[in-house]
C-alpha cells in the first residue's frame, strides 16, 4: 500500500485499555491530581453509576432517559416529558461520540443535547461505538478515555445495521420500569425527520453517511470531516465518497471545525467534496481560536439550521 494512503495525527493513538493507574501514578504521569480534575471526576462518577446498575440504570432529566440494548451493544435514549403520551410525532437527533467516547457520558455531561431536546421538543439518541468500555482515565494527550472505542470509518457498512436499529428504536429495555415504556409505542412518536451529529471520530462517520441512503434529514460533522486526512486510508475513504449518490442533494449538512483544530484540513476537504458532488445546502464553519474540542455552544445553531431547513 502507498505511504500516501495513511496520514496520521499522533493524538489518534489510544492507550491500551485496562491499564488502570493509581492516583499517585496519574498525578506523576499527567501532572494532575484526579481528585481535583473535575471533568475527569465527573466522567468517573458517571461510569461508576452506570457500572453499578448495569443495563438497568434509569434517570429523569426533564423526561425519560434510559439504555436500549442491541446484542452486545446499546444506545441511550431521551424522551422529553412534554413529548410523551400526547399522540404527536417529534423529530429525532442521533449523536455519535468521538474516539474513546461513551454514550452515557455524552448524554449526561459532555453535551447539552438533553437540555436542548427538552427546550425544543425533540427526541435524542446517543449511539455507542465498537469496543470495550473501561474506567475513564486521562490519556497521554489530555483527553478523557473510556477505552479503545471507535466507529468504523474505513468500512462504515459494518456499523450500518446498528445505526439502522437505532433509527428504528430497536432493542430491549432491561430496567425495573420496562413495563411503563413500550418501544413499539415510543417508535410511533418518531416523525420522518431524523438528524445525525457526529463529533471527531463520530464526525468522520457522519460525513461518510452523506454518501449512503439511510434517509437522514440533516447531517453535522463536528471536528472530523474527511477521514482520509485524519489517520484513515485515503484510498478507502475515496471509494466511499465516489459511490453513486442515491440521497437528496439538498439535505442540510454542516461541516464544523475550529481554526486551531488539527482536523481543519480534513473538514475543509469534506466541504470541498460535498460542493464538488453538487450538494446544495452545505455550511462550513471554522470557529476562531477553537481547538479540537466538542463545541457545545454551537448545538443550538446546528439544531436550528436542521429544523428551519426541513420544517416543511
Swiss-Prot record:
EC number: 3.-.-.-
Listed InterPro entries: AB_hydrolase_fold, PLipase/COase/thioEstase
PROSITE patterns (alphabetical): LIPASE_SER (PS00120)
Plastid keyword on record: no
The entry's keywords: Hydrolase
UniProt-annotated catalytic positions: 200, 261, 292
Recorded GO MF terms: hydrolase activity
The family this protein is said to belong to: Belongs to the AB hydrolase superfamily. AB hydrolase 2 family.
Name the record gives this protein: Uncharacterized hydrolase R843
